[in-house]
Structure formats: C-alpha cells, structure tokens
Curated annotation (Swiss-Prot):
Pyridoxal 5'-phosphate binds at residues 76-77, 102, 152, 171, 194, 236-237. One of its GO terms (molecular function) is pyridoxal phosphate binding. It comes from Marinomonas sp. (strain MWYL1). Pfam families: Aminotran_5. Its EC number is 2.6.1.52. InterPro entries: Aminotrans_V_dom, Pser_aminoTfrase, PyrdxlP-dep_Trfase, PyrdxlP-dep_Trfase_major, PyrdxlP-dep_Trfase_small. Homodimer. It comes from the Bacteria. This is Phosphoserine aminotransferase. It is an enzyme of class 2 (transferase). It is found in: Cytoplasm. The lineage of its organism: Bacteria, Pseudomonadati, Pseudomonadota, Gammaproteobacteria, Oceanospirillales. Catalyzes the reversible conversion of 3-phosphohydroxypyruvate to phosphoserine and of 3-hydroxy-2-oxo-4-phosphonooxybutanoate to phosphohydroxythreonine.
Length: 359
C-alpha cells in the first residue's frame, strides 16, 4: 500500500501517525476489549477521552476558564444557524464581514433569525482582498460581529481583527490550530473538524461563558449552547469516534511542538508554493499577496484547456484532489497541518515538469 499526498480541502489529510495509532487501537482501546466506536458515551473510558480532548485543546490554544469548550454535532454550516439562534436573542441585528463564499453562506442563514448588517464586503473585488477595517460600518448595539478569517474557496486569509466592543464570532474551520490565536479577543470560535482536527461530523465551539446567558429556553435543547455546556456536550450521544480522533490529532500536534511550531512549518510550506507560482509565467494566483491563505492555495493555468490533463497527470503522480472548487474552477492545493513539506516539494516538482512539457 502506498499513500498519496492528499490536497483535498476537506475532509482533509490526517497525520499518518494518528491514523496508525487509531488503527492499532481500533479493536481494543487501551485494554477495554471494545472499540471507541462501540463504547458507551457515558462510560468512564469515553469520559476520559472527552476530558483529554478538552484539556489538550485548552493547552494548545491557551483557552482560559472564561470559555466553555463544546463539541457540537453536524458541521460548521449547522453553526451558521445555531449561532444567531442563540446569540441574537434580544438583539435587533448582527454584523457580518463578507470576505468570501463561506461568509456569504453564514449571512444567508443568519437572515432567517435576525436582521443582518453587512459591515463590509470584498465581493466587488471578486473576494481577492479584504475590506479596509477603518471603513466598516459597525453597529455597536448589534449582537455580535461575524468573520471568516480564512476563505477556503478563494484562498484568502487575514489575521488582524476589526476594532470593536462587539463579541467577535469567528469561523476558524480551516485555520484552527494552524496559527497562534488570542482566544480572549473572541466571543465565539467555531470550527468544523474535517480540515485541521479530524473527521467530519463534529464542530469545536469555544464560547465565552457570559454569552451562554443569551440562549433561550425556547430553543431545541440540542441547539441550546447553555444546555450543551451544562451537559458537557452530551445532551444526546455525541460523535464519539470523531472526538477520539480529534484528541489523537491534538496529541500529535503537542508532539510537534504545539501551535507555535506548526505555524512556522505552515509559513514555510505556503511561502515555497507561492514563491514558485510567482516565479512562473504559466501559473498565477489572483489573491492580494497581503491576504493569501496559508492553508488553501488556488492557482490558475495560463491555458485553461490544460486543466483536465493537469488533474489527470497529477493524480497519476500521487498528488490527489487538486481541482479548484466547482464555483471558481482552476486548481487548489489545500495544505493543512498534516501536509508535510515533502508534499509541497512533490507538488512543485510536478508543476515545474508540467510547465516544461505543456507551457
């Protein structure tokens, strides 16, 4: 068996060490005689897994006791509705920064629950840059400000935050644990697992405890952040195996030196790929260099008719899932934490050879 380099935007590659450990423990977790997939979510064994996952994540992100860590079922798209349903209660509106496809989806869903104030948008620039924060039309009486600091489809990322007293709600699905984040500056951080954390099916939700009081008892219990916090994310059976794998990924990340260490690796990976693209007359990236994503690198071939051949030859070379999102086309390399530098080097070597053959 030979594994390929998987550049899928999600579900994304997992560290091979994590997969091997899960494989070794699959039939018998730590002598329990059962798989994690089979054990009761209220057993002492699973409770220890859940506690470990929360503790490791707290260490990795330096999360204070002012925050609650929830493991929410579904994907981040579920939170597009769940967040306004909980946090906009008692408020007339919520503010949103529109920087790409995922911001737009969050805006669309939030409109079903509250008045949405789009305080800034880069749609007119085809989402290749970020609005000037000094021009944002923030309503300080709103429920919160929602942002998506990394847009996977457009390959755009920003690290700075707007100046506001509003709770900042951030979709970090594609950047969580890839770079250092000051959690204390956020009201809510949420992230679907299937990019940098584990398999699909669970969402990490880090919520400032004072915001839990906004959740109304009229909400379904399974959607109520306060009820989820009171029940340690276990109002019903949580996605146990996904949480277990997340804990293994957290363990792996600690062994790499933590978020600070992986961030430096991610900088080197992204810089190498962007440097090659910029040096080429055959490939190009449309995003403002200031806001290029470290996690998702879209690129365009000079001759669009060669795209199918590029994908065919790259897959044959062991470079999987390089097609851009169906809404934008082109190519895209998603290079999350689990992608080693060797994968970037292999991609660059292939791209150089393809250009020599077809450029």
């Amino acid at each position: 068996m030979s594994r390929v380099y998987n550049f899928c935007s999600g579900p994304a590659a997992l560290p091979e060490a994590v997969l091997k450990k899960a494989q070794a423990e699959l039939l018998d977790w730590h002598g329990a005689g059962v798989s994690v997939m089979e054990m009761s979510h209220r057993s002492s064994e699973f409770m220890s897994i859940l506690a470990s996952a929360k503790a490791r994540l707290s260490r990795l992100m330096n999360i204070s006791d002012d925050y609650e860590i929830l493991f929410v079922q579904g994907g981040a798209s579920t939170l597009f509705s769940q967040i306004p349903a909980n946090l906009a209660n008692g408020f007339e509106s919520a503010c949103f920064l529109d920087t790409g496809a995922w911001s737009s989806k969050a805006i669309k869903e939030a409109k079903k629950y509250t008045k949405v104030n789009v305080v800034g948008s880069s749609k007119a620039q085809n989402y290749t840059t970020v609005p000037d924060f000094s021009t944002l039309e923030l309503d300080e009486s709103a429920a919160y400000l929602h942002i998506c600091p990394n847009e996977t489809i457009g390959g755009l990322e920003f690290a700075d935050l707007p100046e506001t007293n509003l709770p900042i709600v951030a979709d970090l699905s594609s950047t969580i644990l890839s770079r250092k984040v000051d959690v204390s500056k956020y009201g809510v951080i949420y992230a679907g697992a299937q990019k940098n954390v584990g398999p699909a099916g669970v969402v990490i939700c880090i919520i400032r405890k004072d915001l839990l009081a906004r959740s109304s008892d009229d909400l379904p219990a399974i959607w109520n952040f306060a009820h989820l916090a009171e029940n340690d994310s276990m109002i019903n059976t949580p996605p146990t195996f996904a949480i277990y794998l997340a804990d293994l990924v957290f363990e792996w990340l600690e062994a790499q030196g933590g978020v600070e260490a992986i961030e430096q690796i991610n900088i080197r990976k992204a810089q190498a790929l962007y440097d090659f693209i910029d040096s080429s007359n055959f490939y190009s990236n449309p995003v403002d260099p200031v806001y290029r994503s470290r996690m998702n690198v879209p690129f365009i071939l000079a001759d669009e008719s060669l795209e199918a051949l590029f994908l065919q030859e790259s897959e044959a070379a062991g470079l999987r899932t390089l097609a851009g999102h169906r809404s934008v086309g082109g190519m895209r390399a998603s290079i999350y934490n689990a992608m080693p530098m060797e994968g970037i080097e292999a991609l660059i070597e292939f791209m150089r050879g393809f250009e020599e053959r077809h450029g």
